[in-house]
Amino acid sequence: MRINRRQGGRSVLTVLLVSWCAVNVAIAEASEQRLSTVDMKIVERGRYLSKIGGCNDCHTPGYLLSEGKTPEKLWLTGDSFGWRGPWGTTYPTNLRLFVSSLTEDQWVSTAKSLKARPPMPWFNLNAMEENDLRALYQFIRYLGPDGAPAPAYVPPDKEPNPPYALFPSPPQ
């Protein structure tokens, strides 16, 4: 049997098209399976904790100014608004990128031992119950990785790019 170039090209195109479809079906099935294995009660608990715990106040761009009406798709993606004080200038971490690189146990360990610069209330995170930390992790993972990394820390002797809030030095 002899196949001319046109028939051979069609055969290759058909194989590629079928392969592409099979890969997309497998991806869709894996995504559906991931969603079906998520315990939505735990995710909802994490959503609640991120709201009442104040996580969004800093880690979600525009959250405070919108009175909490920022779309959830932007939640916990960090911010380029800096917090400047005697410690330097810090920026709210993109928690969705950060958490996507950790296992649940790594997140719990990190949250329990974190020591961060102001204004992050790391001591409150350290004090959270393990089941609440796990719920917060599940919620952040449910949101999925998105956004860009926050700007890097700026030492006290360097001028940060605006915008930033300036904290006064404590009284002596």
Regions inferred by a protein language model and the residue ranges of each:
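Signal peptide processing junction and immediate N-terminal pro/mature segment
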Residues: 25-32
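A structural feature that tracks compact, well-ordered secondary-structure segments
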Residues: 96-100, 109-114, 122-125
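An amphipathic alpha-helix signature
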Residues: 104-112, 130, 134-137
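Bacterial N-terminal signal peptides
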Residues: 12-24
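Bacterial N-terminal signal peptides that target proteins for export
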Residues: 2-15
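Mid-chain, structured segments of secreted extracytoplasmic proteins
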Residues: 82-108
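Flexible coil segments in periplasmic/lumen-exposed cytochrome c-class electron-transfer proteins
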Residues: 32-41, 52, 60-90, 118, ...
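Local sequence-structure signature of Cys/Sec-based thiol-disulfide redox active-site neighborhoods
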Residues: 47-53
